[in-house]
Amino acid sequence: MSMLTITIDGKTTSVPEGSTILDAAKTLDIDIPTLCYLNLEALSINNKAASCRVCVVEVEGRRNLAPSCATPVTDNMVVKTNSLRVLNARRTVLELLLSDHPKDCLVCAKSGECELQTLAERFGIRESPYDGGEMSHYRKDISASIIRDMDKCIMCRRCETMCNTVQTCGVLSGVNRGFTAVVAPAFEMNLADTVCTNCGQCVAVCPTGALVEHEYIWEVVEALANPDKVVIVQTAPAVRAALGEDLGVAPGTSVTGKMAAALRRLGFDHVFDTDFAADLTIMEEGSEFLDRLGKHLAGDTNVKLPILTSCCPGWVKFFEHQFPDMLDVPSTAKSPQQMFGAIAKTYYADLLGIPREKLVVVSVMPCLAKKYECARPEFSVNGNPDVDIVITTRELAKLVKRMNIDFAGLPDEDFDAPLGASTGAAPIFGVTGGVIEAALRTAYELATGETLKKVDFEDVRGMDGVKKAKVKVGDNELVIGVAHGLGNARELLKPCGAGETFHAIEVMACPGGCIGGGGQPYHHGDVELLKKRTQVLYAEDAGKPLRKSHENPYIIELYEKFLGKPLSERSHQLLHTHYFKRQRL
C-alpha cells in the first residue's frame, strides 16, 4: 500500500492511501473535535456521516473548509486545524446546534457525559446568538430500558448506524426536515412497539441526552430504606471490569472486591454474584447440549442443532422477531440473571425463612435489555417478579457517588455465601466467546469422564465479529460458532439455513460481548477500553482455583439439596423458559 505525506499544523507524517485527514491527525496526537463521527474499526463499526461539520479544517489550495472525518488525504496535503476561520466555523456550527437544543443541562441524565456540552465548554460558548425556535416538538418515548427525548437529537446518525448497519434491526431512520428532523422509528411508534431488542447500543453511542437508559436508582434507594424488605443484590461479570472507570479507578482494573464493599455500604442485606448463576447456567445449558447432541448422533432427526445460547436478552428478542421459525432451536435455559432470581426467591428465601414477596432482588448489569428481561411476565410468580429491579453499571456508579462512598479507598471484600461463589468459567461470560468456552470446559468432562488438561479455548476468543472453531470432544469433532453484534449473528445463521453444520452457536448482542453493553461506562469510541475490560475478565478466570462450572461446591450443594440434577423437573420449572413469536413491525 502506497504512503502519502501530509502536513498538519506544521507537523509532517505519512499515512496509508485511503486515510482521512482525521486519521492522519490522530497519528500526530492532534485532537480534531467531532460529533457525528464514530469509528470502532476493530469491531468493523463506523459512522462517517460528515453531517455535523464540527471537524472542518482548512486545506491549502481549497476554497471551502473540508470535513476531516470524510476527506481523504492526498500526497503533500497541507492542513490547518486551528486557524481563525476554522475556529469561527466550529463555533457557528455549535451555536446553531444549540439554537433549538433544550437548555436543561442541570437536570439532563447525560450531563457531564454529553459531547455537545463538552464541545460548547471547549469553545467557550456562553450564549447562543441564534433563535432556532426552541420548543418541544416531540413527546418523550419511555420504555422499560430506554428513554428517547428527540428534542435533544442533533441528527448525528450514530444510533441509526448502530441499529441498522451493526444490529440490522432497522428500527431507526431519519424523519422530517429542518428543525423537526430527528432519527426515530417510522410513524412515531414507541420503541416498545417495534422490533427494538433493547440492546442499548444506540444509547452507548448517542453524543447527547436524546437516548439514555431508563434509570431505576430511586427505586433501589426506596427498597433499601424499607425495613420490611430483605434486599439482596447480584452483579454481572462485566460490571467489575468497567465500574471503576466512572469512580476514579484506571481502566483495565478489576474492582470486584471494592464493588462488593461498596454494595454493603449502600445497605444491601446480602451481596451476591451473578457469576454463581453463570456456573448454574452452564450446568443446565451444557447438559441440554449434551442431551441434544447424544440424540442427534444416535440418529434422532427430531433433535434441533445447533443449539443457540440464550443468555443475552437482546439476542433472545431479536430471534423472536427475526427468526420465528427457529424458536425450538435456542437453549431453553434462562439467562444467569433470571436463574439467580428464581433460585433467590425459592431456595434462598427458604433458607432465610421468609416468603418470596419479602425478598427484593436487585441486579447490577452492563445491559439495558436486562431491564426489559426482568419485566417479561413469564419470569414472575403470581405477579411477583424473580428479579425486581435492574440498574446498569453507570447507575451503580451514580449511586455510589450520591451516597458519598470513597470507592477507590475501600478495602477489597468477598461476596456472601452461598450465592456468591463461582469458578473461573463464570467471569468470562462477560466477553464474546466466553459462554461457549465455559460450556465446552464442562461438556468435555461430563461427556468423556476425563480431566480437561487445557481449559483455555483460544479459537473462540477475540474481537472478530464472527468466529468458527472445531473442538474435539471424545470421538466427536464439534463445530462451534461465535458472533457478537446482531448483524453478525444474522450472517452466522445464514450458512446454517444453507446446510452448513454447526453444533453450538453463541451470540451476544453487544460489541465485544457484555463488556461493551449498553449500560457500561461510555467508551466514546475507544476500542482499547473494551479490550482492557476483556483482559480483566480473562485474568479473573485465570486466577481462580477452580475453572470449571461443575466444580463449584455451592452449585453441587444446590443440586444435592434442592434441584436434584441438571434438567430435572424442578430445574425445568425454575431454570428453563420458552420463547414467543413476535411481530416484525
From Swiss-Prot:
InterPro entries in the cross-refs: 2Fe-2S_ferredoxin-like_sf, 2Fe-2S_ferredoxin-type, 4Fe4S_Fe-S-bd, 4Fe4S_Fe_S_CS, Cytosolic_Fe-S_CAF, Fe_hydrogenase, Fe_hydrogenase_lsu_C, Fe_hydrogenase_ssu
Enzyme class per UniProt: oxidoreductase
Keyword ATP-binding: no
Cofactor(s) the protein requires to work: [4Fe-4S] cluster
NCBIfam families documented for this protein: FeFe_hydrog_A (TIGR02512), FeFe_hydrog_A6 (NF040763)
Keyword Chloroplast among UniProt keywords: no
Subunit structure: Heterotetramer composed of HndA, HndB, HndC and HndD subunits. HndD is probably the hydrogenase subunit.
An example Gene Ontology molecular-function term: iron ion binding
Name assigned to this protein: NADP-reducing hydrogenase subunit HndD
Residues the entry annotates as binding [2Fe-2S] cluster: 36, 52, 55, 69
Domain 4Fe-4S His(Cys)3-ligated-type residues, every copy: 85-124
Pfam family, one: NADH-G_4Fe-4S_3
UniProt xrefs under CDD domains: fer2
Binding site for [4Fe-4S] cluster: 101, 105, 108, 114
Every 4Fe-4S ferredoxin-type domain range: 144-174, 185-216
Source organism: Solidesulfovibrio fructosivorans (Desulfovibrio fructosivorans)
Reaction catalyzed: H2 + NADP(+) = NADPH + H(+)
Gene: hndD
pH dependence: Optimum pH is 8.
Keywords noted in UniProt: 2Fe-2S, 4Fe-4S, Iron, Iron-sulfur, Metal-binding, NADP, Oxidoreductase, Repeat
Summary of the function given for this chain in its UniProt record: Catalyzes the reduction of NADP in the presence of molecular H(2) to yield NADPH.
Boundaries of every 2Fe-2S ferredoxin-type domain copy: 2-85
